[in-house]
Amino acid sequence: MLLTPAATADASPMEQSFEGNPIVVINITYEAGIGGGSDIEGDIVLELFLNWAPITVTNFVGLVNESFYDGIFFHRVIDDFVIQAGDPTCTAVGVYPASDPSCGSNGSGETIPFEADANLTHINGALGMARSVDPDSASSQFYICDGPQHGLDN
């Protein structure tokens, strides 16, 4: 992942870009293998809302700056729901929850408290921190919404 200054976004509080917010660019490479398909490479650009989730943003940016996410797989990809990554043990080709149940259950070792803000909602492309049933259990795992997922709000 690369942290870079840039502008992004569209229009709802989260669909507007706010000057000074950190922008994270995730470079994705997919090499077709036994799953088939075509090789793909591209960037996912995320704006982080520092005013609405300062602890979460500081944690995420810190992990990016430490290269924590480099080489980590998206271990959960569910069409019309989310794509999820951030488990440091999910780095070997072919290691996914189906073949290694521990893949997808680990994190950075540090947890952060849940931050709620009325402006934060699970719109298409929204970034969220994965957590267990304990609201204060987020660590390094994150997801990106594939379509609106308002059932995940709060």
Label the predicted regions:
Residues L2-N154:
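Cyclophilin-like peptidyl-prolyl cis-trans isomerases
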